[in-house]
Amino acid sequence: MKLTIVHNKSGITKKQFKMFDEFFKLLQKEFPLKEDLKIEFLGVRKDKMTTGSRLPNYIKVLCQNRMTRDIFRTVAHEWVHEHQHTIEKRKIGPDIGGKNEDEANAYAGQLVKIFEKKYPEYVENMYE
């Protein structure tokens, strides 16, 4: 799986890049994807997205005025959805509630906490 990262006025600093790379490795370990994935980090909302959205093989994440921890949670949430649909072959469910959405919410929170325990040197940066 090849991961392509695009920054569109995201505000993510070079200092944060290494931290993001480690988080992507954790996501791939816990929820492995087979197909290539593009993640676009945005400084401004696109279309009707909330803080994140997913299309097949493409995730958009809003970064402006958000803590790194919140951005990570959104990335994880959408990554779990990508896994649900491409690996588990689940159908798209409701945006509010439902098995897919509830699992993505729960796993996203867990993945952020796992990352913080595994990389305590980044904990302070998570709140920037």
Where are these regions (language model features)?
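Zn2+-dependent metallopeptidase catalytic core
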Residues: T13-E35
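Active-site scaffold of zinc-dependent metalloenzymes
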Residues: L33-R69, E82, T86
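Post-HEXXH active-site segment of zinc metalloproteases
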Residues: R69-R73, H85-I114, P120-E124
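Histidine-centered divalent metal-coordination motifs
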Residues: H77, H81
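Short acidic DE-rich linear segments
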Residues: M126-E128
